[in-house]
A protein has these predicted regions:
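Catalytic-core region of carbohydrate-active enzymes that cleave or remodel glycosidic bonds
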Residues: 46, 175-191, 199-221, 230-394
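Acidic/polar residues at beta-strand termini and the immediately following turn/coil
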Residues: 111-113, 121, 467, 586, ...
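Short, solvent-exposed loop/turn elements at domain surfaces
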Residues: 135-138, 223-225, 542-544
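Flexible internal linker/loop segments at domain or repeat junctions
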Residues: 222-232, 547-554
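Long, low-hydrophobicity ectodomains and other hydrophilic envelope-associated domains
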Residues: 327, 333-334, 338-584, 601
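C-terminal beta-strand-rich structural cap/linker in extracellular carbohydrate-active enzymes
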Residues: 602-624
Length: 624
């Protein structure tokens, strides 16, 4: 794990054994000492390799009848996934009591292999209070619903005429404040986050006010319909993909960590690493946790229907054995940590006249997305964009966009742009916000962004260009240059290299979809680097793998067996200037027989794809 650049691992230990710490029995309150010992030793091993740990304190826990908590006892029900007891966690004292009991027992426990309590170990870099749960999410028993309704009626006596959302928000915020204070009393020193999905602007605001950092979970093409079917859509053909919703979740002045992310196992998965690297770097996010490295779901767990249990890379969420993911993981990690792609030059914050308004819900932190004229639709592909909430301090942005407000609000401040609420029933002009922001940026002499309606989104740094019509991303920085997507029959000119699939090398078939990158390994610009990693990966699948097309145009994945088959990416890499040699690399990173590129005019050309590898090491040719 450390060799490929992993430096943070997330654990969710509060699940039933053998997959978690909770021992069998009528209650979920007993920790299995043997399983705790395994966790302790794994934490020690990670620490030895310089890998930090993120610990969830409430994630998979399913309360049991003996716990005395009035909540749904099953993870899956008609309302979807109910983790942590669902909304009941935030208003049932018994649920809070059990939560704190588990936290105290785990965090004050001394790891025998490190000789440190978890509250004292600096390797535990961050904690999450709750996973994917809010009082705004579904999943209550009928008696639980009546209890919550009664609490709301009591609240109305002192808050007449106020919305139910305000009551829910206040209730949840009080829980997070008291729970965070309790964890500090236990001795937790690391940053603490609330949850990792934003359930609308009220929930986003309370996370900003209470949490030390903001977190978000997000997936592309996640299985649906019995957790077996997915759409086989390339994100590169969709404007912004999931990075728009991630940008909505990020908050000005707060660290931002993506605690779950994946592009699931469709044939376009090779786009995942470089796309994510590009826009996490542009947005200046602080970390990406892929879910997951390798899962331990087993037959009969309910998840084996779509995870696969036959070997190969059949688990949809796992990346460990998937060449489309792991062939690029190391370079993406290195480039992210070293800052090979620059953060955006322009910082834009989005604030809300009223976080409880329909405007905030529809054009800002909507639970399931936002309207086409939201500032988060196109701007995150070109500038740095954050949400901003009253009461949460943050540095001044280049431009503050306020959603909603009285006509004329913000007049006299060129750095504040107020977007008034459209009239009810009015047609939505999806370019309205984009147009207004671009005009204001021009007035402020900020870096130019793409014109409204363009299908190619260029970052204000000039390093990224995402052509959503063609489905191609190019990265063009001094230390990393790449092309991702539908590159077949295209010649893509970058600053130091040309990635050429328009010329047919030796009559070989061209790839339809691939990711090709050249990354400096020694930290020098590619023009001077003595070690350049060339990576080329297209499709990969297991032997015998089946994708069954469904009646809705979606697909079901049926895992195959080892060995995994990798499509050769046949093309040409062209450059001018100094002479380089190329070493194809084995799967272990060892050099094979050197290749001398061909001369072409004043430059050289390396034909790739016939060497049985996804990696080449380019080094100066010292023999000339």
């Amino acid at each position: 794990m450390a060799q490929v650049g992993i430096n943070l691992v997330r654990f969710a230990p509060d699940r039933d054994s053998p997959l978690g710490l909770l021992a069998p029995g009528p209650t979920s309150r007993r920790i299995d000492p043997a399983l705790l010992d395994r966790l302790d030793y794994f934490v020690k091993c990670l620490k030895d390799q310089g890998i930090y740990v993120r610990l969830d304190l409430m994630h998979y826990r399913m309360f049991r009848p003996g716990d005395g908590v009035d909540c749904l006892m099953s993870q899956t029900n008609a309302s979807g996934h109910v983790y942590c007891g669902g909304p009941a966690l935030f208003f049932q004292p018994r649920a809070t009591e059990i939560y704190r009991e588990f936290a105290a027992e785990l965090l004050r426990h001394t790891n025998p292999y490190t000789k440190l309590r978890y509250v004292d170990d600096p390797a535990l870099a961050t904690f999450g209070m709750v996973n994917e749960t809010s009082i705004f999410s579904g999943g209550l028993t009928e008696t639980g619903r009546r209890t919550l309704d009664g609490l709301f009626q009591d609240w109305l006596k002192t808050h007449p005429g106020k919305e139910r959302d305000r009551f829910l928000s206040e209730t949840e915020q009080r829980w997070y404040e008291s729970t965070k204070a309790y964890l500090r009393q236990l001795g937790v020193k690391a940053p603490i986050a609330c949850t990792n999905i934003t359930y609308g602007t009220p929930n986003g605001q309370l996370q900003a006010l209470v949490g030390d950092q903001i977190e978000n979970n997000r997936y592309w093409d996640s299985p649906h319909r019995d957790w077996r079917w997915f759409w086989e859509r390339p994100m590169l053909k969709e404007r912004g993909g999931v990075y728009r919703s991630m940008a909505r979740a990020a908050v000005a002045g707060k660290p931002f960590l993506v605690t779950e992310f994946n592009l699931n196992d469709n044939q376009y998965r090779s786009e995942a690493q470089l796309l994510t690297l590009a826009y996490a770097s542009l947005q200046d996010w602080d970390g990406i946790l892929w879910w997951d490295y390798h899962n331990s779901y087993t037959a009969g767990s309910g998840f084996d229907k779509f995870m696969g249990t036959t070997g190969g890379n059949g688990e949809l969420f796992s990346i460990r054995d998937n060449p489309m993911m792991m062939a690029q993981f190391g370079l993406a990690s290195l480039a992210f940590r070293r800052g090979y792609i620059s953060p955006a030059r322009t910082a834009i914050d989005v604030t809300y006249a009223d976080v409880f308004s329909a405007t905030a819900r529809d054009r800002g932190q909507g639970r399931r997305g936002s309207s086409p004229d939201s500032p988060f639709e196109a701007l995150p592909l070109m500038c740095r964009v954050r949400s901003r909430y009253d009461g949460a301090s943050s540095p001044r942005a280049d431009l503050l966009i306020q959603l909603g407000g009285a006509p004329g609000a913000g007049a006299g401040d060129p750095h504040r742009l107020v977007l008034e609420t459209p009239a009810p029933g009015a047609a939505v002009d999806e370019l309205r916000t984009w147009r207004a922001v671009r005009e204001r940026m021009q007035q402020l002499d900020l870096p130019a962004i793409s014109a409204p309606g363009d299908t190619t989104f260029r970052s204000d740094t000039g390093q990224l260009a995402w052509d959503t019509k063609e489905g191609v991303l190019t990265i063009d920085s001094s230390k990393l240059q790449a092309a991702v997507g539908f590159v077949g029959q295209k010649r893509l000119q970058l600053a130091d290299f040309t990635i050429d699939f328009a010329s047919d090398p030796a009559g070989a078939a061209q790839p339809t979809f691939a990711a090709i990158s050249l990354c400096s390994l020694d930290g020098l610009p590619l023009k001077q680097s003595a070690r350049i990693l060339l990576t080329a990966i297209g499709r990969a699948e297991d032997t015998g793998e089946i994708r069954e097309q469904g009646p809705e145009g979606d697909f079901a994945f049926i895992g195959g067996l080892a060995p995994t088959l990798v499509e050769p990416v046949r093309g040409r890499i062209v450059w001018q200037g100094r002479k380089l040699r190329a070493f194809p690399l084995t799967a272990a990173g060892e050099r094979m027989t050197a290749i001398t590129p061909d001369a072409e005019g004043d430059g050289q050309v390396l034909t790739i794809g016939g060497d049985g590898t996804t990696w080449y090491e380019l080094v100066p040719d010292l023999g000339t």
